[in-house]
Every structure is written in structure tokens, then in C-alpha cells.
Amino acid sequence: MIIRPYQASDLSEVLNLLSSNIPTYFAPEEYEDLKTYLAHEIEDYYVVEQDNHIVAAGGINYKEQDAYISWDFVDSHMHGSGIGKQLLQYRLDRIKTQGKVKRIIVRTSQFAYGFYEKNGFVIKEQHKDYWAPGFDMIFMVYQEN
């Protein structure tokens, strides 16, 4: 398993990963949102390669002294394999080495918040139908143990 920075040539594989998680974890309209993000809003974004295939992806965005865990997903056939946890930990470690970040945030849905909760994030807010009808936004902050 290799974690490396995203490259433009990864686009179709990353979009296929997202598609494998629609509609269980992401709303169909988020497909276009991800394309926009990767084209115009990307800051630090990483992919996980296994056997020459991208099996997970996730990013970090920054705003003032906050770091946002963004656009996380793992191939739907590999959920529970530990790859998502490894990618999350990789990004948390990168954020911590910068020193300027005071708070690590994730905005997720009611379908994925349990993953973040198990990995040290605490719910601070919830907004109904934020991402799309039936997809609430759960605002969580990392609390290091």
C-alpha cells in the first residue's frame, strides 16, 4: 500500500471510487462537486494505491488556523479493511507537523460520522439535509487522546 499525492491523471479512478459509494454514503449530486473540488479547490489531496489501483482518497484543506479533512472515501468493496483509518492517520500526522493548525475539522454525513467518532472526532453540530435531501451534515472536531 502506498499513500501519495493526487495527480490529475488519477481523476477517473478517484471519480470511480466516489461512484462506488453513491448513494450509500454520498448523494449523486456530489459527483459534480468532487470534480469541481479536484479542478479548483484542491490543496493537499492524497490517494492510496494497492496493486497499481487507487483504492482510497482524501484531502486536507486549510482556513486560517483550521484544517479540514475533506473528500474521504474508500472503494466500497474495501470498507472495514483499515485503509481509511491509515489514510486518515497519515493526514492527521501531516497536519500536526505544521504546527500552525489549532483545530482539525471534518464535515461528514450521518452515514459516515461513526468512522470519525471511532478515530477521535467529537460531534459539535448537525445540520439536516445539508449536502442533499436525506444527507445531513455532521460537524466534528478532532480531540487528541
Q: Where do the model's predicted regions map?
A:
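Active-site rim helix/loop that mediates acceptor-substrate recognition in acyltransferases
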Residues: T24-V47
